[in-house]
Amino acid sequence: MGSGARFPSGTLRVRWLLLLGLVGPVLGAARPGFQQTSHLSSYEIITPWRLTRERREAPRPYSKQVSYVIQAEGKEHIIHLERNKDLLPEDFVVYTYNKEGTLITDHPNIQNHCHYRGYVEGVHNSSIALSDCFGLRGLLHLENASYGIEPLQNSSHFEHIIYRMDDVYKEPLKCGVSNKDIEKETAKDEEEEPPSMTQLLRRRRAVLPQTRYVELFIVVDKERYDMMGRNQTAVREEMILLANYLDSMYIMLNIRIVLVGLEIWTNGNLINIVGGAGDVLGNFVQWREKFLITRRRHDSAQLVLKKGFGGTAGMAFVGTVCSRSHAGGINVFGQITVETFASIVAHELGHNLGMNHDDGRDCSCGAKSCIMNSGASGSRNFSSCSAEDFEKLTLNKGGNCLLNIPKPDEAYSAPSCGNKLVDAGEECDCGTPKECELDPCCEGSTCKLKSFAECAYGDCCKDCRFLPGGTLCRGKTSECDVPEYCNGSSQFCQPDVFIQNGYPCQNNKAYCYNGMCQYYDAQCQVIFGSKAKAAPKDCFIEVNSKGDRFGNCGFSGNEYKKCATGNALCGKLQCENVQEIPVFGIVPAIIQTPSRGTKCWGVDFQLGSDVPDPGMVNEGTKCGAGKICRNFQCVDASVLNYDCDVQKKCHGHGVCNSNKNCHCENGWAPPNCETKGYGGSVDSGPTYNEMNTALRDGLLVFFFLIVPLIVCAIFIFIKRDQLWRSYFRKKRSQTYESDGKNQANPSRQPGSVPRHVSPVTPPREVPIYANRFAVPTYAAKQPQQFPSRPPPPQPKVSSQGNLIPARPAPAPPLYSSLT
């Protein structure tokens, strides 16, 4: 789009004529309203044409796909658009209030909405976010420039104005970063040539290969509703358009924005918006936690206000996108276009996603400024630093909720296989045909599971199969958290729960608060290293009573607020025993304050006026007996509404979780921890793995029964010969003994056998043992008697065979007892 290009007929170039007051005679009947162009330094008037097979025809909205020819800076471009099916879920909900303050719930039929995304033909890495509800309105991002387009007011010929986003006047916005840092960054940008958008996109895709999904909820305050003429439909369409713009920006980081709900405060604001931005942000996230999150599940909520805060465009918590208590931000939507406002919301939502300001860092985005620049310059590009910050969030498990692909009942109802969202009627969606080549579970052409697959995605899906029940899918992160397990029949992990707020932790020195045990020492160690600890109370009182950037209890309007003595422990964190200087990727300001023999260490991160200071004492920290810090005040811990009697409700074998259900210790079964079991709760999923239990039992049987039997069999086989010989030796020995007993028992011998064995030649069948003779049996056992003289010598026996006596042997002599 060179400046020397010739303008075609029908396209009027208007540059700087507004400043000279000459625009009236030039534009004639086509003159736009002054209010429509008062914020522009330059613009063109064009007439887009819709393309069909016949090349051109009159505009006809609400098509699924459409192409237009537009002209900008003398050059004709063809843009191709496709309805953004991922933008709105089937159960998109709008909350409003009647005059009595009663909540009204509406599910508008918006399946055939008119919000599109697309690209410019022939322009690499271009992107478009447009609506054609009442003409073309939206953003076009080309290689090196971004353009806005909107219908020309009161035109009957489909005329539009198109302008560079750099030509939009912007109100200077206050930021906490000093001008010196901004000038230093500007000088650095001028010296170094930034990389091309192609290089940046390639780098980001390498860093963020997995698509994340932010389920966004938007709340519009009463003043902004009044500003829109109290037209609920107009507010709704404007916020849907805003979400479409956000989606076109975040898609560069492989992040998709899904608008899941909208609430319009039609009958009055439901929070106090008096005070500074920090006060309003605190009020909003408290209202969100108490009322909104119970009505509609979402990852982040953004409040849209008409009221300004002295030049501060918005404010949000950093890295809290999945938090129940802090995943929110506030955004000022005053006299600016929705295109410009989109960059503000993208900036504040970026803080929720863990992104810090780019100021003072070596960041590039292919443009003069980036979305996360503290000046809220209206940029459409995220920087390399933002991609790195978001990567850190995901690596630290801070964005687990973003991995939840919208379920079929939460996806846009019009089926569109290939958009990587599981729409109604689909079982999976692997994306483009090329992407589906790498998916082993999903049929890309039908978005159905393959015949052997049970699932295709989710924390509890592996190798196209459900992980067995009891498989850990979300681990315990602190002593105030509880783990979650797969249930064996779903690819999704159980919803994240934690121990109920107010439960004692750290040996009763602190309370659980939103899944973390909040106490001073732990916060000091996070900032100043493992040796640091909380400073004495006198440090808190002395420093926080000053009411400056290093010691305060928040803001009162645009000024720091001094801490009352009773609230000093809930202001700026004060530590001692500091031996390490923190390294955060940014340069914080550290201050030492001597106090009664010690040094009080405090820190100011200088993140800007739109970011809460992480150097303040964490909410939920115990500041006294039965008290906690809340909104920079030391209040009674009863505000946590802890009502769990673990002895009665959980029978002393568990704790209550954030859903007020018992989470049982190992060995006890939910729901009341009264009977034996495997622990867990009705919310956590089964804590034991049935397959693992069967495997365990099988291993026990194998090692304690089968293995010993096998060892015995091997031993017997090896020693078989020795055992066999031992067996027969014992058998033979038993036989000999039996025979000897039979010979000694006359009642069992035949009559031909003599009753006394001759000492000269014993029978052959009777074994001869050395120095042993057969002892005759008598009717009554007598003590052994010995003769008074030795027996006669035995005669020698010749070797002439066995001798047979001529007459029977004489009967044995009878001996009387020895006297």
Curated annotation (Swiss-Prot):
Ranges of compositional bias, category Polar residues: 735-750
Keyword RNA-binding in record: no
Q: Name one GO molecular function term.
A: protein kinase C binding
Binding of Zn(2+) occurs at 347, 351, 357
Sites of Phosphothreonine modification: 761
Q: Which residues form the active site?
A: 348
Where do the Peptidase M12B domain residues begin and end?
212-406
What cystine pairs are annotated? Answer: 322-401, 363-385, 365-370, 473-493, 644-656, 650-662, 664-673
E.C. code: 3.4.24.-
Q: Which residues lie on this side of the membrane: Cytoplasmic?
A: 719-819
Q: What is the activity-regulation note?
A: Synthesized as an inactive form which is proteolytically cleaved to generate an active enzyme. Processing at the upstream site is particularly important for activation of the proenzyme, whereas processing at the boundary between the pro-domain and the catalytic domain does not appear to be essential. Inhibited by hydroxamic acid-based inhibitors.
Cofactor(s) named in the record: Zn(2+)
Keywords attached to this Swiss-Prot or TrEMBL record, sorted alphabetically, are:
Cell membrane, Cone-rod dystrophy, Disulfide bond, Glycoprotein, Hydrolase, Membrane, Metal-binding, Metalloprotease, Phosphoprotein, Protease, Secreted, Signal, Transmembrane, Transmembrane helix, Zinc
Query: What does this chain do?
Result: Metalloprotease that cleaves and releases a number of molecules with important roles in tumorigenesis and angiogenesis, such as TEK, KDR, EPHB4, CD40, VCAM1 and CDH5. May mediate cell-cell, cell-matrix interactions and regulate the motility of cells via interactions with integrins.
Q: What is this protein called?
A: Disintegrin and metalloproteinase domain-containing protein 9
Organism this protein belongs to: Homo sapiens
Q: What is the lineage of its organism?
A: Eukaryota, Metazoa, Chordata, Craniata, Vertebrata
Q: Which gene encodes it?
A: ADAM9
